[in-house]
Amino acid sequence: MGRGSEEDRLYHEVAKHMEEIIAPVERDLIKAELTKEAFLRYTNNGNNEVYLVNYHTAPHIMREIGRLRELTFRGAGGGTGLALDIDENDTCEHNYDQLIAWNPEDEEIIAGYRVIRCNNAIDREGNIHLSTSHYFDFSEEFKKQYLPYSIELGRSWVQPRYQPSVDNRKGLFSLDNLWDGLGALVVLNPDIKYLFGKVTMYPRFNAEARDLLIYFMEHYFPDRKKLLKPLDNLFLGYKTDISTFEGIFDGLDYKEGYKILNKRVRELGENIPPLINTYMNLSPTMMTFGTAMNDEFGEVEETGILITIDDIYEVKKDRHIKTFERDKVYGSRTKESTQ
């Protein structure tokens, strides 16, 4: 059997038991919830718009997000297997907000994140209601020194029609649009110092390429303070014999190491996942916290990450953060002004 054929067989076996995804939500219901109050900014590219909504303020948008998330993640080998991907993190009292990029010309939600100020996810008894707490053990230092000043990012997605592999023109700026939204959140929450979350890899990703990528992240973006670690029962180590590339990055700066990583991953028939690529090229001081299995979501693999906002490269700050003042005025971009 060829490479991946057994994984493909298992994937299709699982797919048989998945529910049919719901029909698209009516555009008029979505547009009615894209209010001035929910508007964050216009994007740097594509004349798209970024909004911040939640299940309680925009139930129809939330339903469409649930549909698009399931469509996107299921297509990549993950997903819930349900008719739409909405869980208690979206709907509970300490609910996440939904950061979305909207294409007004196509009338489509093209991409999204769910986000929460971590101090809003702690109840009166001190229990932490964060997605990452299901997979990672938080140190006391992290709880006291980092969590109160962090925004957690999760469930990042770009719907299939707007992925570069499907439509290069439309897909080119999909993730970039979301980062414009994150830039707005950084400005609007000046006490926030960190962006915290996890990046996903799917079980069908080549095992050697996966191990090389994790080895690279541990080498260039280590957690020297031992702030977080995967829960013991969910911890995922290396799957292959890493002695073939151990020491491969020793003595190399990040750019040199990245060239080797990119070349080797491509030789193994894969590409570095776009979101991981974005995070790695955002800040030199990013920290990674090991990899855990998400057994609630198609057994995808989650690697914890933390970015210090002050350390984000200036070129990225200029692009996503400093443009907020220019792009934040609702209605300032009419068709006439953008021609």
Regions found by a protein language model. Give the residues of each.
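Conserved N-terminal entry element of GNAT/NAT acetyltransferase domains
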Residues: E13-H56
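Acyl-donor binding region in acyl/amide transferases
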Residues: E70, T80, N120-T285
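C-terminal non-catalytic accessory extensions
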Residues: G298-Q339
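Short amphipathic alpha-helix that is part of the acyltransferase structural core
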Residues: Y42-D87, D97-R114
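Catalytic micro-motifs at enzyme active sites that drive phosphoryl/nucleotidyl and oxygen chemistry
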Residues: A83-D90, D97-W102, D137-K143, A184, ...
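A contiguous, low-structure linker/loop signature
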Residues: W102-T132
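Aromatic sugar-binding interfaces of carbohydrate-active proteins
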Residues: P274-N281, M286-I307
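A short helix-loop-beta-strand connector motif used in the catalytic cores of GNAT acetyltransferases and
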Residues: D90-I100, D123, M286-M287, F297-T303, ...
